[in-house]
């Protein structure tokens, strides 16, 4: 610029600086250079501007206590806030700032350090704007934090980035129709092809988000301490060919000498860098140029009144492509203004003098923000551990259990002992005697109960199926089902909308395994509304011995499953609750559970891998879609794991579905979700707050999904291999996390670690998880990653994996028996031999050794009966009086 158009006089201690060179770059306005005199080329006179950024005149008093939170003061768009806006926004808080009114510091907030020490500074960059037809999600701004040493009275400059503007609502009726989806680029540009130099389409993209910067002055030059980059703006519409896009990780610069260049751009502007210069109106301005956001492209404003500008902090203005995000280095955007080209995020920065506290993560969905708080220095403590006492404005050392802090606030002293050794000895002897008596009483009761249960036949899938098919009716009352002398169970009325299936229309075929409440069978059902052909289903039943609470839990599971309707959640076909036994009919998932499928799909040396990385990503995407549906319906599953996910088939057209809303035992009992007592906790799938405090939120399932991802990409291995539940609890409580599975792609493992954030609010929701999995499916490096080759045969990681998953493939009835109201009432009986056809052999005896089996999933003991006990399976030293039908 020439002095004939503008002349800036910088008055400071060193003298006067004149602008007379066309290549001159405006120097950064410092407090020592105020007041400023501006020469107006039209009026040709000097007008003084009052000094408002002088450090000695700052109004915020020293000694106030934090934390201090700085925001945009209600400002939005290209320009920053004013002093009046910030005075109103910070009313009632301890934050007092001075806002620049002119020059490069216009909109920048100046704050003084209240005391010398270390401070934790957390910065949030602003998000990018949404496109007209690309509005499902916006590009998140970057968050990061670092620790810096600041001195009392030192001025700190805070530039809070503002969100890039959205394309909608537009500025004209035609653009508003595009926003509503009632018009497109072809209709709105009809007739403009003959205009010379006019492009077919312009506008509809979102502006880039502004960067949030914290800096100070060194020798009159700005020195950035922390820069949180802004998110890029979304394009007019989503990319039609998603296979060529890939997720870009958050970028961080830590070199002080690194260039702060601006992003490349075309019709849409790139984001500004720390030392860049804007070469077009659409490009974002650097802090040296006032940090304003770039303007929307002129073609878009002339055609349809689009005006999506970049946010304050250097966000690039939009055209059809999205604007680039601001940062230490600005984000690029499309130079050819493609309709589907999103603007890129900027690059964040941490000065080498600071200590990075949290890695950058794209989380901000709106305007930027800055939080500054005192960071305690624990170097003087003997155990290097302390807590900040806000009331005393000091760090108090933490002492281990059994000691207390001395008056010097440093030394840990042993607690005084008041009890004499004689009293302690007496207490120990009394406790030992009481423990011995209680142990003897427990052993006596256990012995008596074992003698009473000796020879009792435990129910199994074969026995329960035979009872359901038997015509003999037992009339003895079941004390666990109803009280002696009362009438049989009354029918349960169903809520509206649920399909009632008559027991006469249900045919049992074979046993599939054991569920949460009873056996699960494969069968056929007829007579459904709108379908006359038999439909294969999975039938869940209540066991013979059940309490009233079990019946209520069974009904609750039926109501929950019937409520959901999603392609990735097992569908409820119908219910039968008018007579005992109660039945829940679910769609049959012939592919089995995901854990078993993954274990049997492990590639071996010299064999072609049955699965690809695309197959594993598809399984993860299916379950994530089901979890997203549950999250939108405010439902917390609490037990997302591979064992609870079912597959429609084992072939290439498989679909994974969430199939357990009560299959884990006691999942609806209150004790299941409490720590301690007789609880069943899936320790290896639960976050720290659920294990330690019993807190469950929507982010509980996010943690569990991260563990499920680990199971999928390890091909069915048990999480935290080789560790007990207590070791896992200690492991995650101290901030440790699992290593990636063998050959796991980096972007997939990053999703796992984001799901395993210690703070629940930092974990992504399932909408973000789905978006990141979609990026992985478009990354060639991820898709071409090889699967780990299993060197040997498949081993059982846990003994309990063989329990409850028995598949009786040969168990077939010679003739399917309809489940009539007469034979449904039979829960006992032994007339099984009559079902054996000629030429069929009985089940070969198997030995069962007495043992207790540890369940590594839930942390519970599952007892097995002693040898010779009749458990519904033939033994080595005896034969049953009845045979299992259909075994050859």
Swiss-Prot record:
Q: How does it sit in the membrane?
A: Single-pass type I membrane protein
Activity regulation, free text: Activated by ligand-binding, leading to homodimerization and autophosphorylation.
PROSITE patterns from the UniProt entry: PROTEIN_KINASE_ATP, PROTEIN_KINASE_DOM, PROTEIN_KINASE_TYR, RECEPTOR_TYR_KIN_II
GO molecular function terms here? ATP binding; protein kinase activity; receptor signaling protein tyrosine kinase activator activity; transmembrane receptor protein tyrosine kinase activity
GO CC entries: endoplasmic reticulum; membrane; plasma membrane
Regions crossing the membrane? 422-446
Q: What is its EC number?
A: 2.7.10.1
Record PTM: Phosphorylated at tyrosine residues by autocatalysis, which activates kinase activity.
Role noted for this protein = Receptor with a tyrosine-protein kinase activity. Following activation by ALKAL1 or ALKAL2 ligands at the cell surface, transduces an extracellular signal into an intracellular response. Ligand-binding to the extracellular domain induces tyrosine kinase activation, leading to activation of the mitogen-activated protein kinase (MAPK) pathway. Phosphorylates almost exclusively at the first tyrosine of the Y-x-x-x-Y-Y motif.
Task: Write the protein's name.
Answer: Leukocyte tyrosine kinase receptor
Query: Which organism is this protein's natural source?
Result: Mus musculus
Lineage, opening ranks: Eukaryota, Metazoa, Chordata, Craniata, Vertebrata
Q: Which gene encodes it?
A: Ltk
């Amino acid at each position: 610029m020439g002095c004939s158009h503008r002349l800036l006089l910088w008055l400071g201690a060193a003298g006067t600086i004149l602008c007379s060179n066309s290549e001159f770059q405006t120097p950064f306005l410092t407090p020592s250079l105020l007041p400023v005199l501006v020469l107006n080329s039209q009026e040709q006179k000097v007008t003084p501007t009052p000094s408002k950024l002088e450090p000695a005149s700052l109004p915020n008093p020293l000694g106030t206590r934090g934390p201090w939170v700085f925001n945009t003061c209600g400002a939005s768009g290209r320009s920053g806030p004013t002093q009046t806006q910030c005075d109103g926004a910070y009313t009632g808080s301890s934050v007092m700032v001075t806002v620049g009114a002119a020059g490069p510091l216009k909109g920048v907030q100046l704050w003084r350090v209240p005391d010398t020490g270390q401070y934790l500074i957390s910065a949030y960059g602003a998000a990018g704007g949404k496109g007209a037809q690309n509005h499902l999600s916006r590009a998140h701004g970057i968050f990061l934090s670092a620790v810096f040493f600041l001195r009392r009275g030192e001025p700190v400059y805070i530039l809070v980035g503002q969100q890039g503007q959205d394309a909608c609502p537009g500025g004209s009726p035609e653009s508003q129709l595009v926003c509503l989806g009632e018009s497109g680029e072809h209709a709105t540009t009809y007739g403009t092809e003959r205009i010379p130099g006019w492009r077919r389409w312009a506008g509809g993209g979102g502006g880039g988000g502004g960067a949030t910067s914290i800096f100070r002055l060194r020798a009159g030059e700005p020195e950035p301490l922390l820069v949180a980059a802004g998110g890029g703006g979304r394009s007019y519409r989503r990319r039609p060919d998603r296979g060529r896009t890939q997720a870009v990780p958050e970028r961080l610069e830590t070199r002080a000498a690194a260039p702060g260049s601006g992003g490349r751009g075309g019709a849409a502007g790139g984001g500004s860098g720390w030392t860049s210069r804007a070469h077009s109106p659409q490009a974002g301005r650097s802090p040296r140029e006032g940090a304003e956001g770039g303007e929307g492209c002129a073609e878009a404003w002339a055609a349809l009144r689009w005006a999506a500008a970049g946010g304050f902090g250097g966000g690039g203005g939009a055209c059809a492509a999205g604007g680039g995000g601001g940062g230490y280095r600005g984000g690029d955007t499309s130079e050819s203004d493609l309709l589907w080209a999103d603007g890129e995020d900027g690059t964040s920065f941490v000065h080498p003098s600071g200590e990075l506290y949290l890695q950058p993560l794209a989380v901000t969905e709106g305007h930027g923000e800055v939080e500054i708080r005192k960071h305690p220095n624990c170097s003087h403590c003997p155990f290097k551990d302390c807590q900040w006492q806000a009331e005393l404005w000091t760090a108090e050392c933490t002492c281990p259990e059994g000691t207390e802090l001395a008056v010097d606030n440093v030394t840990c002293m042993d607690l005084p002992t008041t009890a004499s050794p004689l009293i302690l000895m007496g207490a120990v002897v009394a406790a030992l005697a009481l423990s011995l008596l209680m142990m003897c009483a427990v052993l006596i009761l256990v012995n008596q109960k074992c003698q009473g249960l000796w020879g009792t036949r435990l129910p199994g899938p074969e026995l329960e199926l035979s009872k359901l098919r038997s015509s003999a009716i037992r009339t003895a009352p079941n004390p666990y089902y109803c009280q002696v002398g009362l009438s049989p169970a009354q029918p349960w009325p169903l809520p509206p909308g649920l399909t009632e299936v008559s027991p006469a229309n249900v045919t049992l075929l074979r046993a599939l395994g054991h569920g949460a409440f009873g056996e699960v069978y494969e069968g056929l059902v007829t007579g459904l509304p709108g379908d006359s052909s038999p439909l294969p289903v999975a039938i869940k039943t209540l066991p013979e011995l059940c309490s009233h609470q079990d019946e209520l839990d069974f009904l609750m599971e039926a109501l929950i499953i019937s409520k959901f309707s999603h392609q990735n959640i097992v569908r409820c076909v119908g219910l039968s609750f008018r007579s005992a036994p109660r039945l829940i009919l679910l769609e049959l998932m012939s592919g089995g559970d995901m854990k078993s499928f993954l274990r049997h799909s492990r590639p071996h040396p010299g064999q072609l891998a049955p699965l690809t990385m695309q197959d594993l990503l598809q399984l993860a995407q299916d379950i994530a879609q089901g979890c997203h549906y549950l999250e939108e319906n405010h439902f917390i599953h609490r037990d997302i794991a591979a064992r609870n996910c079912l597959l429609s088939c084992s072939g290439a057209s498989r679909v994974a579905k969430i199939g357990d809303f009560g299959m884990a035992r006691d999942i609806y009992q209150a004790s299941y979700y409490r720590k301690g007592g007789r609880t069943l906790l899936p320790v290896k799938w639960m976050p720290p707050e659920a294990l330690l405090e019993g807190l469950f939120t929507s982010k509980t399932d996010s943690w569990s999904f991260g563990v499920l991802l680990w199971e999928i990409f390890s091909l069915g291995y048990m999480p935290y291999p080789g560790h007990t539940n207590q070791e896992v609890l200690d492991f995650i409580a101290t901030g440790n996390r699992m290593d990636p599975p063998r050959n796991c792609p980096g972007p997939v493992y990053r999703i796992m670690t984001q799901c395993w954030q210690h703070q629940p609010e930092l974990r992504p929701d399932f909408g973000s998880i789905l978006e990141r999995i979609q990026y992985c499916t478009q990354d060639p490096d991820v898709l071409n990653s090889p699967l780990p080759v299993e060197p040997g045969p498949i081993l059982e990681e846990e003994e309990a994996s063989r329990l409850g998953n028995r598949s009786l493939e040969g168990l077939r009835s010679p003739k399917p028996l309809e489940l009539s109201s007469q034979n449904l009432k039979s829960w006992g009986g032994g007339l099984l031999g009559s079902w054996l056809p000629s030429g069929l052999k009985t089940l070969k005896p198997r030995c069962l050794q007495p043992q207790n089996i540890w369940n590594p999933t839930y942390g519970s003991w599952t007892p097995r009966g002693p040898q010779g006990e009749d458990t519904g399976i033939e033994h080595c030293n005896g034969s049953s009086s009845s045979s299992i039908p259909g075994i050859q």
